Amino acid sequence: MTIVDIAKEAGYSVSTVSRVLNGRRDVSEEARDRIMRIVEAYQFVPNNNAKHLKQTVSQSILILVKGTSNMLFTNIIEVIQDTIEGSDYSLRVHYLDEDADEVKEAVRMCREHKPMGILFLGGNIQYFHEEFELVNVPCVLVTDRADKLGFRNLASVSTDDMAAAEMAVDYLFDHGHRDIAVIGGDMALSSPSKYRKAGAKRSFIKHGCEFEEESYAVARFSYESAYNAMNRMLASKRSITAVFAMSDVMAVGAMRAIFD
C-alpha cells in the first residue's frame, strides 16, 4: 500500500492525501475522514525514504522538550501555541527524558515527519557537536548558546546563566548567609547547570568563602529528585541556612523537603 493506492481508493488526489498525512488544515473534513479511515484500515505508515514518494516538508513546527517538569518550558509552549493559532502551521510537541540525546531524536523526526523547523527547549551542547549536521531544517536552541557551533541552520536564545546564578547567590550572601547549599543538574548532561554552578562558585569566591563540592547536590530537574536531594543534604547534618536551586521545580521540591 502506497500513498498513490490510498489516493485511488479514497477518490482524491495524491496531494490531498499528502496534506492529510502532514496534518494540514486546508482539507475538508469529509476528505480527511475518508482518507484516515483507509489509512487506519490498512495500517498505512508513510515511507518517507521511498524514492517514488514526493519529498515534501510539512507545515508542522517540532518542539523537542528535555524533561517534563520545567515550568518555564510549559509557558513557552503556551505562548507559541497562541502565536500560531489560526495560521497554516501546526505544532508537534515531543517530550524527551533529560538524559536523552535530543539531536539523535531530531534526526529521526526529520526523517519520519519532515517538520519545517525545530525548537529545542533544553539540551546538551555536546550532542550538537556530534550529529547536528544531519539535521537539515532551521532550528532554534533555547537555554544555551549556539553561535560558536558554526551551523548556519542553528540559532539560539538564552540567558546568561552564569551571571544570573551569581546574582542569586549574591542575594543570599547579602542577607547574611554563609552556609549555602546548591541543588542543580548533572554537569555531564546539562550545559546550563555548568554555567549556573560556575556562577555560584564565583559568588562564593567574591564573598571570601570556599565552594565545597559537598555543598552541591546533583538532582534531575524534577520535584521528586530535588526533594530527595534536599533530604540527603539535610541528613548530612551540615549547618545549611540557605539553598540556591537551579530551577523553579527544584526549588519547590527542596522547600517541601525542608518543611517536612
Q: Predicted segments — roles?
A:
Residues 16-19, 53-69, 171, 179-187:
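Short beta-strand segments enriched in small/hydrophobic residues
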Residues 56-170, 174, 235, 239:
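Alpha-helical recognition/docking segments in bacterial nutrient-uptake
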Residues 95-97, 184, 215-218:
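Residue-level recognition of beta-strand->loop/alpha-helix junctions
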Residues 155-182, 198-202, 223-233, 251:
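Hydrophobic alpha-helical segments within soluble ligand-binding/sensing domains
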